[in-house]
Structure formats: C-alpha cells, structure tokens
Amino acid sequence: MDTPNKDDSIIRFSVSLQQNLLDELDNRIIKNGYSSRSELVRDMIREKLVEDNWAEDNPNDESKIAVLVVIYDHHQRELNQRMIDIQHASGTHVLCTTHIHMDAHNCLETIILQGNSSEIQRLQLEIGGLRGVKFAKLTKASSFECNE
C-alpha cells in the first residue's frame, strides 16, 4: 500500500468574500466549466504562484519553462533564419520546436524553452519584434515541485 504524500492530502479552509466577488467567482465557475469553487480557486492560486515564481529573477535559476507561440509570414525574407539565429544566440535552452503551415502565407511555430526568466522573456521580445512576426505569446509554466 502506498503511503500518502503530504501534498496529496486536501486541507479545507474558509475564505471571506464580499457578495460581488463571490458572484463573480460563481460566474467564472459556470463560464469555464469548473466542477466546484475549490477547483477554480486552486487554478487561480497556481496561476499566481507561477506569476510570482517568474517575477523572482535569479540569473542562476535555469528551471523556468515556457512555450512561445509565434505566427509569422513565411514569405518575409530571411525571417525563419533570423528566428533560428536568435534561438541559437540565446542563453535559453530550446527543448523542442514544432512548425505548421496554417495557410498559404502564415506559419505557426511553438518553441518550448527552459532557462532563467529574463533570458526567456528576452528571446520572446526579440522574436516578437522581428518584421513579419504577427503574433508572439509566451505561456509561462511551473511543475510546482517543492524543494525540501
């Protein structure tokens, strides 16, 4: 029999809210298809923890991970090569890229990155600022591993 991990146990606690905040919370539960208030609150806490974790910019912390989604005009001269050059010159580890042809003019690329937050964000800004790039969005993530 497996011994329960302390992270697996659920702790119940109460929160006091004004009625308008509770109404907004309940509206989001319905709108986003959550099964309970607890599920929504857990997601909101995780999102805030990722945001705070990324704000702590330690240059020696190479554990940040993110996905950069880029849509660009593949007819833009040398754009693809410039994007590759930026990735190679960056201090960020490019773990994986996926490239798809959306239509006759546009490509979508996902780039999975690992490194410190400032290097990852710098790479996103450099690629996003290239002529021919129509969209560049960075999605920040965390595994929520606890260092004990």
UniProtKB/Swiss-Prot annotation:
Q: Does the keyword DNA-binding apply?
A: yes
Which InterPro entries does the record match to this protein? Acetolactate_synth/TF_NikR_C, ACT-like_dom_sf, Arc_rbn_hlx_hlx, CopG, CopG/NikR_regulator, Ni_resp_reg_NikR, Ribbon_hlx_hlx, TF_NikR_Ni-bd_C
Keyword Isomerase, does the record have it? no
Q: What biological-process terms (Gene Ontology) are attached?
A: response to nickel cation
Listed GO MF terms: DNA binding; DNA-binding transcription factor activity; nickel cation binding
Cofactor info, note text: Binds 1 nickel ion per subunit.
- Give the record's keywords alphabetically: DNA-binding, Metal-binding, Nickel, Transcription, Transcription regulation
Binding residues annotated for Ni(2+), in chain numbering: H88, H99, H101, C107
Report the cofactors.
Ni(2+)
Origin, by domain of life?
A: Bacteria
Report the Pfam families cross-referenced here: NikR_C, RHH_1
What does the function comment of this entry state?
Transcriptional regulator.
Family as reported in the entry's similarity comment: Belongs to the transcriptional regulatory CopG/NikR family.
Official protein name in the record: Putative nickel-responsive regulator
Species = Helicobacter pylori (strain Shi470)
